[in-house]
């Protein structure tokens, strides 16, 4: 039994192609060869069915039900299904012990207790006092000296902006 199992895993083992009996293919290349040969022999491909447990098994359509009941790879799949259903039955979700940490902040309360109005750019700032500085409207400041402005175009001409002239 052990030799048979090792023999099926040997990547250098030669396998016979189900589409062309003259083809002997190494096991490691067999899946690729099956795809190629299936395309080259559509008449034979229509007569064969693929095993649902191992795509390397190409069986005549009349014998597929017998093959499914006796396929060696079926036991691996069935064992996986059994193990999966057992593990699902044993797994129970542990109830979370996480608790929200205590919080001293109340942002809603802070908003209502706030005495000053929020800062808005370009509007008068009324902070409760009537000083002349508090009634000044904020203006946009520039780092340029007065009388200077930012250039409206780049100092060079980009190749794709050549005023529509083709080169």
From Swiss-Prot:
InterPro entries: TRM13/UPF0224_CHHC_Znf_dom, UPF0224_FAM112_RNA_Proc, Znf_C2H2_sf. GO terms for biological process: cell differentiation; piRNA-mediated gene silencing by mRNA destabilization; secondary piRNA processing; spermatogenesis. Zn(2+) 1 binds at residues 17, 23, 33, 37. Keywords: Cytoplasm, Differentiation, Metal-binding, Repeat, Spermatogenesis, Zinc, Zinc-finger. Pfam families: zf-U11-48K (PF05253). Transmembrane segments: none annotated. One of its GO terms (molecular function) is zinc ion binding. Zn(2+) 2 binds at residues 51, 57, 67, 71. A zinc finger (CHHC U11-48K-type) spans 14-41, 48-75. One of its GO terms (cellular component) is piP-body. It is found in: Cytoplasm. The keyword Zinc-finger applies. PANTHER family: GAMETOCYTE SPECIFIC FACTOR 1-RELATED (PTHR21402), GAMETOCYTE-SPECIFIC FACTOR 1 (PTHR21402:SF9). Belongs to the UPF0224 (FAM112) family. Required for spermatogenesis and is involved in the suppression of retrotransposon transcription in male germ cells. This is Gametocyte-specific factor 1.
């Amino acid at each position: 039994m052990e030799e048979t199992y090792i023999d099926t895993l040997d990547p250098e083992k030669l396998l016979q192609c189900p589409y062309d009996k003259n083809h002997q293919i190494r096991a490691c290349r067999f899946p690729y060869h099956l795809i190629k040969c299936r395309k080259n022999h559509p008449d034979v491909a229509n007569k064969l069915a693929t095993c649902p447990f191992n795509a390397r098994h190409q069986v005549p359509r009349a014998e597929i039900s017998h093959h499914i009941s006796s396929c060696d790879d079926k036991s691996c799949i069935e064992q996986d299904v059994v193990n999966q259903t057992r593990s699902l039955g044993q797994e129970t979700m542990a109830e979370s012990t996480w608790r929200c940490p205590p919080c001293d902040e109340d942002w809603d309360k802070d908003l209502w207790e706030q005495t000053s109005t929020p800062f808005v750019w370009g509007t008068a700032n009324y902070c409760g006092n009537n000083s002349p500085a508090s009634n000044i409207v904020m203006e946009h400041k520039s780092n340029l000296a007065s009388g200077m402005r930012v250039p409206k175009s780049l100092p060079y001409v980009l190749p794709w902006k050549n005023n529509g002239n083709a080169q």
